[in-house]
Amino acid sequence: LQVTLLESPDVAPIGVGEGTWPTMRDTLRKIGVSEADFFRECDASFKQGSRFDGWVTGQHDDRYYHPFVLPHGYTETNLVAGWLARHQDREFAGVVSFQPHLCARNRAPKQASTPEYAAVANYAYHLDAGKFGLFLRAHCTGRLGVAHISDRVVSINASDDGDIASLQLKNHGVVAGDLFVDCTRMQSLLIGQ
């Protein structure tokens, strides 16, 4: 399997803060990324859930909290019925999960001595997306054998069935492939043609 990253020199990466889901931990682990390097290079921090303020009524006390730790016993009983019967004056997540309490106290999901990608509480990351893109490119080209071409797509060459057969680049000729993934955001350079 040969993977080639084709990147336009004319399009600046998005350099805003982003949040991920816990599945990102396993993805990074599987491709051999050091979690310590990832934190350092991408200005990453722990994310233990998502809180949506003003979720239903828009009032200051209206929020929905989605912790990343599954509630104990959630497969054996209807936790919502128990919450409604006994604790509906409190936030559901805080009743069924310890993770909102960790977050409220600014506690991490693991200790400094906990091995990479292991944790007491499930977590994801907040990160700088621009730095993350550069970090992944360096890791994938340096350690995973991904080829990198910085060039512009001039035209798209279709096969008889209408699928993309190859891309004509401004400076690097033709790049053929079996699968093309369009990451050109709103431009939809490949999907739109």
Q: What is each stretch, according to the model?
A:
Residues L1, I31, I191-Q193:
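Short, well-ordered amphipathic alpha-helices
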Residues T4-E7, M24, I31, F38, ...:
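General structural concept
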Residues E7, C42, V154-S155:
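Conserved beta-strand edge residues that scaffold enzyme active sites
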Residues P9-A12, G58, C183-L189:
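Short loop/turn segments at secondary-structure transitions that flank enzyme active sites
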Residues A12-C103:
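Dinucleotide-binding Rossmann-like beta1-alpha1 core, especially the glycine-rich loop
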